[in-house]
Structure formats: structure tokens, C-alpha cells
């Protein structure tokens, strides 16, 4: 039987976020990335969504390590939850390790976790795999791609990347090494598809710095800049522009403060002398000497910018003349919340700058021409598009074919799909592995399933009606009319007639149950009859379907 190498995406396909891929060869497994996704608008009460790792739990004795491409939440956010089920060593670059360590500390997992830092250009042996770290450019420092070497051949896993010829830290993507790998022979390329719909090249991060300088020089008031906390190169450019314009910078927002701490301690951010001040000291400075760097670029409720916009921030009150710069694009699904914050900022008299045309933000992902370069350099025999929704995966497939690849050598999979590669062929296995969504709600992981989510949706949309039935223990008779309690359905004091009708409907339903006046009346049967009758009545008369909960109390 021919030897097989398996590629098993557990997250990141047909979606944005939750990136996780398992590679299996010779009976051993390595895992690349372990990310989370933000909940959708209909996922009430959910903090985040993580991959289903039941396949990995079942095969944890065969796992040789977790390899992380970079420190964004969609690549590291699920690590604490997964580590509680699978104890495996983590390999990553130094800055990524600093961010992961913050998560491990929060979940008290530092002592039990083996966290190994690896420099770009170095390799790690993990069982039958040798994983080579290759520097790439992205919107976070210390990002890498992996060349995963096996006896069957080499897989290039790009992670998130772009080609930036003028990066802020001076470290360009290692195209030379990718070209060498192409000459040596690449069995399979697994590449980022996020920006495949965009033609051309992604602009350099450096252009944003020039925009900051123009904005700062043309403003005589306070400036507030919001961006992704993880984009230390973006924050570095804010600091540099402020220093050149003679302004002081204060930072607010927990994730921004944490990121500043890690990046400065590890040397990935250099704060100009006498530029950074505590936010409580800003009030003593003229407004034209102030810059605030804050979280909240996605309109997140309770983020620092959100609290400023809605006047609940303890230190900062937005006023007329303030210039607010949104140096980030709205993640798909966040447009409404971002718009709400922008509207409130305008309402307070602030000038809000957020147009993409002003080059206030550039993507961290490769556009079409950059992807073509990677395909041309690596010359893969097989190709698997990763990281994207279905249309992105399909368009990336088309791009690969334009580069000369045979369609039979390209696999578009779903999460849980098993891609099998021999030396000469690639196919999607008829068998898949579990790869659904696991919901994180507070300290609960996976204890909220489809039924609970359906109940939450119903409660959110139509509310709840509780019918309390006081029953005599002796003879099973109703002692008094049922008490009707509603939440999120309608205001009881203004719905007296409806409440009386509900009481009558509930009493009639209770009396209709077999043995209605007998001591042995079955509580379950009683609850069922009342629930059915009340639900039907409410829908008929209000066209709403609240959750109806009958409660039997025996006295």
C-alpha cells in the first residue's frame, strides 16, 4: 500500500478565523495554528468559537507538536482551551511566544505548557517531521511560514502573509528561501486565500506612516488613533509621527496596553524618548500636544473607543475639534457596530477620518499578484487553498490553474475533510473527521450546543412567558388562577386583558387533563397541556412565539 501524507483542516475553510490544520504522516501528527473566531450576531452570549478537536483528542498520543505561524487571535485564540484537553509542546517565534504566554498566564497553564521559541531560518525536528521557519510579512511582528519536510516531500504552509518591500522593521519576506524550496521540489503548497479577490499588490505598511504624518501636521487639536492592538508596526508609526510633531502619546484599552508591554519588553517596538505618558497626565497638556492610541477599531462594546463615544470612559471625554483616526478596516460582520461608534463620535463634534482612500489602513494579506509570485517560486506539485470563505477558495483555485496547475492537483476541502497525498496523486478521502464549532461561554467550553443556541435565539426574538400553576397536593385542584410572568415579551401592566385571557386558557388546559380534579394528576402531562394551549393562543393573537415555561407548584 502506497505511503500517504494527510492534510486535515480543522478550521479556517469556508469561514474567516478559527484557523487550524493537522498534518499526518507515518502515524504521527503535527498541528499548525489553533485559532478562534468571533461569534456571529445570532450567537447570543457566546464569547468566541473554537475548532472541534475531538479527532486530535482521540489521537493525542500521536501528536508531536503545535506550530504557530503568528500571534493573531484567529491563529492562537483557542490555545488555552485546547491545551486543557491535549498537552502538547508549542513551537513559535519569540514575539508570538510572548503573546501566547499572556494567555497561558490568564488560564494558569504556564507551568504545564512547554513553549519553545524558534527563530526564522531555523528548523525543528518533531517526530517524522522537520519544520522549517521562514520569515514572512504580515500585520503582526515575527510572522512565519512553514516548510514541513517529510520523506515523501515538502509542504509549504504560508500562514497569513503579504510581500512588503519596505516593512517597518526592515525584515522582508524570505522569497529567496521559498525559491530555493521550489528548486528542491515542493510537494504541496497550502496558502492564504483571504485577499485573493483583490487584483494587484497589497500596499506597504510604510504608506500608513506617511498618512499619519499628514494627519498630525494638519491638526491643531487632540488626536485619537484606533487600530488593531496586535499591529505593533502600525502603533510604532503613530509613536514616530507623534514624536516628530512634538506630541505626547497615551495608551488606553487593556489589549493595547498588554501589547505595548510585550512588544517593548521584547524589543519589537521602540518608544521615542519622552513620548509615552500616562493617560491621567494628558489633561495637563495642550490639546495640540496630545495623541491617544486606543482599542475599539471594530466597534467592540466596552472597548476604550466605544466607551469614549458613549461617554463612559473614565479618563477621556470626546469633544468638538477632536480628530479620531480609524486606522483599520471593519472585519466582515462588524460594519454596523463600527458605524454606530462613528455616528456617536460625529454627534459629539469630533472629526472622524476613516476612508480607505486616505491610506489609513493597509491589509496584511497577499493580493493576486503576490499569490502568483509564491506559486511561481514554490512550483508545487499539489495545492490546497486555505484561510477563506468558499468563493475565496474557488478563486484561488482558478488563480493556481492560471499559473499552470492541473485542476486534479488542487483540493478544495471543507473543515474536517481529509486530503490524502501519495507521491503521484492527491484525493479527498470519502471519510472525514469531526470539525464543527465549539462555543466558549464564560468558563464553559462546549457545553452550549445547538439546542441551547436555539433557545437563546428564541428568547432574544420573542421573549419568555412563565405560567405558575398552584396545585393542591391533596386533590390536585388549582388553588388560584395561574400567575403569568413575562420577560422580553410585553409589558404586563399595559396588557391586562391579554393576561386575564392567558389565565383562562391555562386554567382550561389544566382542567382538560385526564383526572384534572384528582390527586394523581401527572405534572408532566399538565405542563404539556398548558404549554401547548398558551403557545397556540399567543401565536394566534400576537403572531409571536415566546418560550412558554409552565411551573407546577404543589401546596
Regions found by a protein language model. Name each.
Residues 2-67, 72-284, 303-317, 336-340:
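His/Asp/Glu-rich metal-coordinating catalytic cores
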Residues 197-327, 331-356, 360-501, 505-520, ...:
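Hard-cation-handling environments
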Residues 13, 37-45, 62-63, 354-357, ...:
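A glycine- and charged-residue-rich anion-binding loop/surface
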Residues 119, 414, 544-548:
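Short Gly/Ser/Thr- and Asp/Glu-enriched loop/turn motifs at secondary-structure junctions
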Residues 89, 384, 549:
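Short glycine-rich phosphate-binding loop at a beta-alpha junction
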Residues 519-555:
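C-terminal tails and terminal domains of large nucleic-acid-associated
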Residues 104, 400, 538:
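Conserved hydrophobic residues forming the short capping helix/wall of the S-adenosyl-L-methionine
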